[in-house]
Amino acid sequence: YLLLLATNIFNYKKEKDVTSEREVELAYLISTKLEIDYSKVTDSMLREFFYIEHIDDVNERVSDKERKNENGRKKSLDDIKKIALTKISDEEVSSVNKEAAYIYYLMNKGYSYAEKIIKNKDVKEEEYAYISENIDSLSGFNTKLDWERIYLYGDTFKSILGNVSSDKQGIPKELANHYLELGYSLDDRVGISYLEYQYENYLKGTKAIYKVGDNNTYSLVSEGKRGNDIVLTIDIELQKRLESILTEEVLNTKYEANTGYYNRSFVVVSNPQTGEILAMSGKQVRKGDDGKYYVVDYTPGIVTLPVTPGSVVKGASILVGYKYNAIDIGTKLMDECIKIKNTPLKCSWRTMGLIDDVYALAYSSNVYQYKIAIKVGNGNYQYDKPLKISDDAFSKYRSMYASFGLGVKTGIDLPVESLGYSGKSKLSGHLLDYAIGQYDTYTPMQLSQYISTI
């Protein structure tokens, strides 16, 4: 699904006894050898570079009075430097070599002991050759190999493959404790979402270990090793076809009548014998500024976005009736509207008359499920009267649903998964709603597990 593309990068790590003056010299030299995007250079970078180049002259511009606080005590060196930087004129700033100033900034941002990235994209052969051949005289400049992800199938399944932090980002703040406890460095590139995060420990490989000698010389102690590959159960051709079909269908559906509240669909294709996920996709419809609809990927919602399942759960609901002797196989019940005091009528989509369990499932009778739920809850139903049920009725249903994978973790190997919403109400009306899939919520992945179990 993806490849690692090796890329050459230039970095700088300040060596012992290297002065600011020497770094200025290096910045000028390197700026003539490397092509770097200098568009991010700022006024403060230019002032800093001018200050370092003319430090004595600029510091002399700060008067004795400006060097003292109101109480007569001497200001800190940092405060004095801030004043000195304001003494640099705009003409002097405009005279600064922008390329050298930006290189100097890259050499000195962050901690002095840290390795700084100078260039990591579009490195030319002659640039790489120059740095490599002159490492001994470039006082801290070096070359090394980095990598970037190449996705062989574009955006297909990309959101579930996940992301890796950039070389500039390193370990994100919210994941720092997790990774630092595992021995990572703050500037390491790490998996930060979905499969990249889930399998980081297998994908990361092993760093080379060096022994640091005098003058920051290095000797190799042990070589690094590449990380492992992981093999997914996803059938990529099926995945591509699924995404194409779903993209087309959600857009077509949105243009149909009575779809004001519709904006997304999910599909999971799995092997019910093994539980393997063969393809999965979620697509969401959005409206652009031009008023036209467009489709975006929403596949993570398969495990993170619980939905009200509706009638699909009636198969599990009818098993509750069998288990707790509310009905037997073939039991016939009258499909007619039910009325609980102070609540609206509860009906099926049409009145079906006297029906058995098979007919009730085939034609999605709500009332058949309502009457099962009343019996499971030991209720005494009378038209338009209050209805009380036993406290354990909900737990009987939830226990059965859980055996099918609803309301419990599916075990999918992704770092985030919602359990869905489990209602707290004990009202009889809500139990009836529950029995037809209109109360608790479940993720599309849980529903896929439910269907596979059946």
Per-segment meaning from a language model:
Residues 1-218, 222-223, 265-266, 272, ...:
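Membrane-proximal periplasmic segments of bacterial cell-envelope enzymes
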Residues 3-4, 24-32, 129, 133, ...:
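Solvent-exposed, polar/charged alpha-helical surfaces in well-ordered, non-transmembrane soluble domains
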Residues 15, 116, 145, 184, ...:
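Residue-level detector of alpha-helix boundaries and kinks
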Residues 16-18, 156-158, 173-175, 244-247, ...:
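Surface-exposed beta-strand edges and their flanking turn/coil or helix-capping segments
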Residues 37, 249-253, 379:
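Solvent-exposed amphipathic alpha-helical surface segments
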Residues 208-225, 234, 238, 259-310, ...:
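Beta-lactam-recognizing serine transpeptidase/beta-lactamase-like catalytic domain environment
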Residues 245-254, 285:
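Structural motif corresponding to the C-terminal cap of alpha-helices
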